[in-house]
């Protein structure tokens, strides 16, 4: 069990974590939001969920304690537990100008409305740099968890704000495994020292953690490929594969296992290692 996270905690000279006060099975102890910089105006990364007054009061406490204000808001991805608090922050925390709220666009691009439509996103792109006193953040497009996911490299600390690409404990969920694995490999190349994750405690052995995430998925992939190689003339439905590969997993978890397995199959199909037919009862087979 991870140590209990404080609601407001200074993690370094330029990073303060404010906990989203929204604990749950997917959010762990809550969404980590971060005030980044050293000056009278700092960047806020992520905003927690909507309608969580405890979070707003923790954020106000942090701004008072560190004698600072919000320069702009950067959202790592569209999920509600990261973008949902924008409206409440704009309403409850006074600013002399309208907050600038930044994120990467959805892919394929689509209109995104914040709350009741009073605020609009300013869209970033991979490689953009966001600066404030004491901090330089470089945008890293890391799709996979979602199609618009970004991590941010804090250059002064060689640290990564990983959003939901990497968590402080356990593993994450993803929409596209092919993209997700490529994103992990890109993050590994940075050779970061620290990861400030979207949920859970700070990760001090950044490279080892990323490598662990990659290995975890590779082991499962090898298991799937071995099964296809040993049965290269056979084709399988997803549930047939689940019953073989997850045979030691309780049956009530097979639906979740099916979701994960399907993402692995789609990745392997993209790579030309297996193929599927177009029947209603889709079957998968080794690509010789």
Curated annotation (Swiss-Prot):
Cofactor field: Zn(2+)
KW Metal-binding (keyword) present: yes
EC class of the enzyme, as a word: hydrolase
Location of the protein in the cell: Mitochondrion matrix
Cofactor detail note: Binds 2 Zn(2+) ions per subunit.
Origin: domain of life: Eukaryota
Residues given in the record as Zn(2+) 2 binding sites: 81-82, 118, 164, 199
Molecular function GO terms recorded: RNA endonuclease activity; single-stranded RNA binding; zinc ion binding
One Pfam family named in its UniProt record: BLACT_WH
EC number: 3.1.27.-
Keywords per UniProt: Acetylation, Endonuclease, Hydrolase, Metal-binding, Mitochondrion, Nuclease, Phosphoprotein, RNA-binding, Zinc
Gene Ontology cellular-component annotations: mitochondrial matrix; mitochondrion
Residues with the N6-acetyllysine modification: 102, 282
Cross-referenced InterPro entries: LACTB2-like_MBL-fold, LACTB2_WH, Metallo-B-lactamas, RibonucZ/Hydroxyglut_hydro, Sec-metab_biosynth-thioest, WH-like_DNA-bd_sf
Function per UniProt: Endoribonuclease; cleaves preferentially 3' to purine-pyrimidine dinucleotide motifs in single-stranded RNA. The cleavage product contains a free 3' -OH group. Has no activity with double-stranded RNA or DNA. Required for normal mitochondrial function and cell viability.
Family in the record: Belongs to the metallo-beta-lactamase superfamily. Glyoxalase II family.
SUBUNIT field: Monomer.
Anything else known: RNAi-mediated down-regulation results in rapid cell death. The reason for this is not clear; there are only minor changes in mitochondrial mRNA levels.
Protein name per its UniProtKB record: Endoribonuclease LACTB2
Organism field: Homo sapiens (Human)
């Amino acid at each position: 069990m991870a140590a209990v996270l404080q609601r407001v905690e200074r993690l370094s000279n330029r990073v303060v974590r404010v906990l989203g006060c929204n604990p749950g099975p997917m959010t762990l102890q809550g969404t980590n939001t971060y005030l980044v910089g050293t000056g009278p105006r700092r960047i806020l990364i992520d905003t927690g969920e909507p309608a969580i007054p405890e979070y707003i009061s923790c954020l106000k406490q942090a701004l008072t304690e560190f004698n600072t204000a919000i320069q702009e808001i950067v959202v790592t991805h569209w999920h509600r537990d990261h973008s949902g608090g924008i409206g409440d922050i704009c309403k409850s925390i006074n600013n002399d100008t309208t907050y600038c709220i930044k994120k990467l666009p959805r892919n394929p691009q689509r209109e995104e409305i914040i709350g009741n439509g009073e605020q609009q996103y300013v869209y970033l792109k991979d490689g953009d740099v966001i600066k404030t006193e004491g901090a330089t953040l470089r945008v890293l497009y890391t799709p996979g968890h979602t199609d618009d996911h970004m991590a941010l490299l804090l250059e002064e600390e060689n640290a990564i704000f990983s959003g939901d690409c990497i968590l402080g404990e356990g593993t994450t969920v993803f929409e596209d495994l092919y993209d997700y694995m490529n994103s992990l490999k890109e993050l590994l190349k940075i050779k970061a020292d620290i990861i400030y994750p979207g949920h859970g405690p700070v990760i001090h052995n950044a490279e080892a953690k990323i490598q662990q995430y990659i290995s975890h998925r590779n082991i499962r992939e090898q298991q799937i490929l071995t099964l296809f190689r040993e049965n290269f003339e056979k084709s399988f439905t997803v549930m047939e594969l689940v019953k073989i590969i997850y045979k030691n997993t309780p049956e009530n978890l097979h639906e979740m296992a099916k979701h994960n397995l399907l993402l692995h199959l789609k990745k392997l199909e993209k790579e030309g290692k297996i193929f599927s037919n177009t029947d209603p009862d889709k079957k998968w087979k080794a690509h010789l």
